UniProtKB/Swiss-Prot annotation:
GTP binds at residues 19-26, 87-91, 141-144. Residues 10-277 form the tr-type G domain. Belongs to the TRAFAC class translation factor GTPase superfamily. Classic translation factor GTPase family. PrfC subfamily. GO terms for biological process: regulation of translational termination. Gene3D superfamilies: P-loop containing nucleotide triphosphate hydrolases, Peptide chain release factor 3, domain III, Translation factors. Keywords: Cytoplasm, GTP-binding, Nucleotide-binding, Protein biosynthesis. It is found in: Cytoplasm. One of its GO terms (cellular component) is cytosol. InterPro entries: EF-G-like_DII, EFG_III/V, G_TR_CS, P-loop_NTPase, PrfC, RF3_C, RF3_dom_3_sf, RF3_GTP-bd. This is Peptide chain release factor 3.
């Protein structure tokens, strides 16, 4: 085993941040980048008039709306570790992109608004992360506002998500009366609104503050000591094994907006979070991240990260070996050899050429149309295929045409590139070949329309055909006469036939009429 490679892998920390919209995910990402020395000041998403947009919200529509709709990747060095943050869309319509991103990380950070507690989108994303069995770290955000009692927030983790919460620090007051954090793990108090080393007060051996400190006489500090005592006696005990399996989550408190508690969280996170681990490939083989053969999988494709060049980037999570510029790889799906001359690392839309990357790193490959989401690539003689990424059956459908028939070329180009990103799905009417788009949520259509106009100068006309139940059919069983006004026959972008049923009743009617025909939810 290559010792140097093993050392590099050990330094990697690759994670995603999950939350409900507006819980402060982008703000905490910005503060981490600040500590990593990547940016000089954190851009606040809300301040749209100032033109200070968040670093991770790089696409035009995100800047206008203040929501993340694509996952972006940010990389930086911190305390001898290489940090790879994958920022994920908080908006529910973009769950496909988010779910795929969660397949490319080794840990997750869950950001919760301390006034609202666990919200629906957090719950959904938590389930995906839990299923993967990777560690989950929790940051209870917005302590600078009046919120719910910390004991309630910890209890809710267990009640709603079924995961044990173990407090790493504890608020002293909240909102207007916030004084600081009682840092259990580091045996100190972190004062609110203080800079530099002045903000830390060491605790006595018995966990109290020296009498000379004014805070020691504050009734709120006494309340905190009582709560800490209660948590120590009745709460969960810190258990590294449970954390590794995703059965226990270390809980940190703070305010990302005022940069309070974030550094303490980040320091603990890089110590506790895992380095890249083995992947299951080829069905049942374990592939070590330190395996000398390079391999990785495409979890995202993004068009127009640089609108001036109309490029496409395939995001690859490295699973094993070491990537070097000019590396020859094989695309597992086609067996096609590809030389990887141009690869890039990210700071949102800023890019630098990659000279080398190891397991845990995310590299962007310039794509001329070779790659699809879920593709595996490998450098050796042994074929390596990673498990398929989750796919979703759309529920909303729209007919789409170009407003200007003279601009068919840009219409088709934009359509194909955006469909290959996997943010929207394309179907064609079996008889007429007209385009039909499918999506998980309405916002995807709006983003599609906006990007077609903004990035491809192609205005589109969209007409809803509403909610539909999509079911694929074996081509050998298909008779086009099975189609009628209640079950539209279309083909997906790979040419596979499927029906879009008006509702579940129409699907049941079809089953009754053709009992021997097998329909499937997803190919």
């Amino acid at each position: 085993m290559d010792k140097e490679l093993a050392e590099k892998v050990k330094k990697r920390r690759t994670f995603a941040i999950i939350s409900h919209p507006d819980a402060g995910k982008t703000t905490i990402t910005e503060q981490m980048l600040l500590f990593g020395g990547v940016i000089r000041k954190a851009g606040t998403v809300k301040a749209r008039k100032t033109g200070n947009f968040a670093t991770s919200d790089w696409m035009e529509i995100e800047k206008k709306r203040g929501i993340s709709v694509t996952s972006s990747v940010m990389q930086f060095e911190y305390k001898g570790k290489r940090i790879n943050i994958l920022d994920t869309p908080g908006h529910q319509d973009f769950s496909e992109d988010t779910y795929r991103t969660l397949m490319a990380v080794d840990a997750a950070v869950m950001v919760i608004d301390s006034a609202k507690g666990i919200e629906p989108q957090t719950k959904k994303l938590f389930k995906v992360v839990k299923k993967r069995g990777i560690p989950i770290f929790t940051f209870m955000n917005k302590l600078d506002r009046d919120g719910r009692p910390p004991l309630d927030l910890i209890a809710e983790l267990e009640d709603l998500l079924g995961i044990e919460g173990v407090a790493m620090d504890w608020p002293i007051g909240s909102g207007q009366t916030l004084k600081g954090l009682y840092d259990v793990a580091n045996n100190r108090v972190e004062l609110y609104r203080k800079d530099g080393e002045d903000r830390f007060l060491p605790l006595n051996e018995d966990g109290t503050l020296p009498d000379s400190e004014p805070l020691s006489q504050d009734p709120q500090f006494q309340d905190t000591l009582d709560e800490i005592e209660l948590v120590k006696e009745a709460g969960n005990k810190f258990d590294p094994e449970k954390i590794a399996l995703g059965d226990q989550t270390p809980v940190f408190f703070g305010s990302a907006l005022t940069n309070f508690g974030v550094e303490t969280f980040l320091n603990s996170f890089v110590d506790l979070a895992p380095a890249p681990e083995s992947h299951t490939v080829n069905g049942d083989e374990e592939l070590s991240p330190e395996d000398p053969e390079f391999s990785g999988f495409v979890f995202k494709i993004q068009a127009n990260m640089n609108p001036h060049h109309r490029d496409r980037i395939a995001f690859v999570r490295v699973g094993s070996g070491e990537f070097k510029r000019g590396l020859d790889v094989t695309l597992a799906r086609t067996g096609k050899p590809i030389r990887l001359n141009n690869a890039t690392e990210f700071m949102s839309s800023e890019r630098v050429q990659v000279s080398d990357a190891v397991a845990g790193d995310i590299v962007g490959l310039y794509d001329t149309g070779n790659f699809q989401i879920g593709d595996s690539i490998y450098s050796g003689k042994r074929k390596i295929v990673y498990p398929p990424l989750p796919e979703f059956t759309p529920e909303l459908f729209m007919r789409v045409t170009a407003k200007n028939v003279m601009k068919q070329k840009s219409f088709h180009k934009g359509m194909n590139q955006l469909v290959q990103e996997g943010a929207i799905q394309l179907y064609r009417n079996y008889q007429t070949d007209e385009y039909i788009l499918g999506a998980v949520g309405q916002l995807q259509f709006e983003v599609f329309q906006f990007r077609m106009k903004n990035e491809y100068n192609s205005e589109v006309e969209m007409n809803s055909i509403g909610h539909r139940v999509a079911r694929w059919i074996d081509p050998e069983q298909l008779d086009p006469r099975m189609s009628n006004s209640r079950n539209l026959l279309v083909k997906d972008r790979y040419g596979n036939p499927l029906f879009l049923f008006e509702n579940e009743f129409a699907e049941r009617f079809f089953h009754d009429k053709y009992p021997d025909v097998k329909l499937t939810e997803k190919l």
